[in-house]
From Swiss-Prot:
IMP binds at residues 14-17, 39-42, 130, 144, 225, 240, 304. This is Adenylosuccinate synthetase. The gene is purA. Belongs to the adenylosuccinate synthetase family. GTP binds at residues 13-19, 41-43, 306, 332-334, 415-417. It comes from Actinobacillus pleuropneumoniae serotype 7 (strain AP76).
């Protein structure tokens, strides 16, 4: 019988999901994106060659895998064509192996214009979006005014809807934000110059998934961003615009929650965050700078430096609750090599003196929160590219064990380098 496994970030994103998805895709028939858009940046390194995927599922690098983009993904036609072009230039067959739900909302130039205008207007209070139009596209979806992939099949009706939407957006862009309007004809022409390519990949993703389940094949759901950026459960309002958690699998693909067999949460051995928002264990000293340097902590999509801090078991406990996580993959263990001591945040001290073991929901409730740390000895030995558990230093094993105890979930996979081969699978999610 086939297994259905979801892989998602259990922190603030950038945990290393792309590598692990790619690692496990040799076991599956389908890899599915179910939320987000081209704001994701999944970095894969295979035999030393680096690939960054933003929209197309990471399974595209395996010839035997069919990649699906579910209805929960907001689709930029421009970004899709650019990414397809990059892959096809390397000889990768995308068009025959990528299927797209007709219910995907489209990201169009006015979404990007609005995203930039709003962030500029917010100034120092900006959310820290990637500026790719993700939020405005999801707004249109919820407001029931958005254009979807299915609208590409009728150009006349599409043009009529586009005109109404542009009137709405351009009024705000010109009169409120004082920026240039988006041109109707150029937008229409640009979309329909590539519409036929997209239409050729449209499929009933939900039916494909349920048939795959019946046929007993393995399916992998690839999450983007991280749990603490979820629109409902993250550090609101400093969040993304989609459900990054396990519940998003069902709503973003039409694959019911009872069909998931295993949820793999990806965690770094420390914590990072990009953009604004609360981050209790953030380090502002030389240790934080050294983690950032050794971990090469710069965003795959934006290039922005990531904020770095100690492992936060409080935030990860919340991720375990929300996602029903079955097991963890811990990445970047090797980045902690050489530190004399390491700290793990085990609880938060709230401004009123209360000690809590689960993270608050809203960003405002994190104000004045202090981390309570447990200090553990570090290790001087090298863990980079170690692929056998017994070859890890005892202090590293103790560190992993303590995290397992604090969050109540086992570490089933360990990553000790960026390449897919630099990994230990202690318990295979597809055999669990």
């Amino acid at each position: 019988m086939g297994k259905s496994v979801a892989i998602l970030g259990a922190q603030w994103g950038d945990e290393g999901k792309g590598k692990i998805v790619d690692l496990l895709t040799d076991r599956v028939k389908y890899v599915v994106r179910y939320q987000g858009g081209h704001n994701a940046g999944h970095t894969l390194i295979i035999n030393g060659e680096k690939t960054v995927l933003r929209l197309i599922p990471s399974g595209i690098l395996r010839d035997n895998v069919t990649c699906l983009i579910g209805n929960g993904v907001v689709l930029s036609p421009e970004a899709l064509m650019k990414e397809m072009g990059e892959l096809e230039a390397r000889g990768i067959n995308v068009r025959d192996r990528l299927k797209i739900s007709e219910a995907c909302p489209l990201i169009l130039p006015y979404h990007v214009a609005m995203d930039h205008a709003r962030e500029a207007a917010l100034g120092k209070n900006k959310i820290g979006t990637t500026g790719r139009g993700i939020g405005p596209a999801y707004e249109d979806k919820v407001a029931r005014r958005g254009l979807r992939v299915s609208d590409l099949f009728d150009k006349e009706a599409f043009a009529e809807k586009l005109k109404d939407i542009l009137d709405y957006y351009n009024f705000q862009l010109v009169h409120y934000y004082k920026v240039e309007p988006v041109d109707f004809q150029k937008t229409l022409d640009d979309v329909f110059a590539i519409a036929d390519v997209i239409k050729g990949m449209v499929a009933d993703v939900t039916t494909l998934l349920h048939q795959a389940r019946k046929d007993g094949v393995n399916i992998l759901f690839e999450g983007a961003q991280g749990t603490m950026l979820d629109i409902d459960h993250g550090t609101y309002p400093f969040v993304t615009s989609s459900n990054t958690t396990a519940g998003g699998v069902a709503t973003g693909s039409g694959f019911g929650p009872r069909n998931l067999d295993y949820v793999l949460g990806i965690i770094k051995a420390y914590c990072t965050r990009v953009g604004s928002g609360p981050f209790t264990t953030e380090l502002f000293d030389e240790v934080g700078a050294e983690i950032a340097r050794k971990g090469n902590e710069f965003g795959a999509v934006t290039g922005r430096p990531r904020r770095c801090g100690w492992f936060d078991a409080v935030a990860v406990r919340r991720a375990v609750q929300i996602n029903s996580i079955s097991g963890f993959c811990m990445t970047k263990l090797d980045v902690l090599d050489g530190f004399e001591e390491l700290k793990i945040c085990t609880a938060y001290k709230m401004p009123n003196g209360e000690i809590v073991e689960y993270a608050p929901m809203a960003a405002k409730d994190w104000k004045g929160v202090e981390p309570i740390y447990e200090t553990m000895p570090g290790w001087s030995e090298n863990t980079f590219r170690v692929t056998k558990r017994e070859e890890l230093p005892q202090a590293a094993l103790d560190y992993i064990k303590r995290i397992e105890e604090l969050v109540g979930v086992p570490v089933d996979i360990l990553s000790t380098g960026p390449d897919r081969v630099e990994t230990m699978i202690l318990r295979d999610p597809f055999a669990a």
